[in-house]
Amino acid sequence: EEVDARLVSSVISSEICAVARRAALMAERRLADAGRGGPPVDYATIVPGPAGRGESLLAADQDHAIVYAEGEPDGPADQWFAALGEEISSILDAVGIPFCKGGVMSKNAAWRMSRARWLETIDRWVRRQRPEDLLNVDIFFDAVGVHGSLSLAEGLLDHAYDEGRRTHSFIKLLSENARGARVPLTLFRNLKTDSDGRIDLKMHGLFPLVAGARVLAIKHGVRARATPGRLQALADLGLVGESKGADLIEAHRTILTAMLTQQLMDGEQGIRLSSRVAPGRLNERTRAALTRAVTAIETMTDLVSEGRF
């Protein structure tokens, strides 16, 4: 029976955030037991990306970051938090949330900094000049604090949104990035699959919707994290037509549902879970809905291309 993947992804994301919080607590205890004491200064554990948006599915890996109140790179505080990040990463991997292929983990210095260094980093991000320089930067705007001094996390996000909104070149880069994905349709508007009969719906389905909603949200000061919430807020502001907004929200639901349905089928057959969907294995109704959803993605691309950013 088909399920609404938005509910499932919200539950999965909530669990990932809860596990990340518990991992941070366990990591603190491990360091204390090893004679390294407790946190030297206030800090927060942050979860960016799909889990922060509430949109993770079954093939999720770990994304997390740390902001601490003060301290220099490689100084005593940073060394303590580096050890904490290593423990958090190892704990999450051990319980089935694998290491992030993109390195978005607090064991890595790029995702573990003092508040002052984070503010400097965000300022550098928004002044970058090439779309390829935005790798993993955009997911920070989906982040949520899950443990510790959450005001530290919220302060960073407030700064990121404020700086991003007022920096036109950054908004333009994000928009170029959002327009870059190929919509998987043939000349005759059928679903276009790869040689294995599958489509990467994360890259060619979710990404244009998520990235487009994100850049419009940043530009217009919408602080909703979930893609449907961003789209609805943009529609409420009159920036996206009510009908178009509804179509995009439904497209997001349909694509998530197709991905979850495929993951459940693959799991039953021992196939590694991924974001790749085989339309030929979906029932006719789901396949038709997926075709409509992919077609609707062009609406988002058009909205960004029209200069709504």
Go through the PLM ranges and name each one:
Residues 1-309:
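A nucleotide- and high-energy phosphate-metabolite-utilizing enzyme signature
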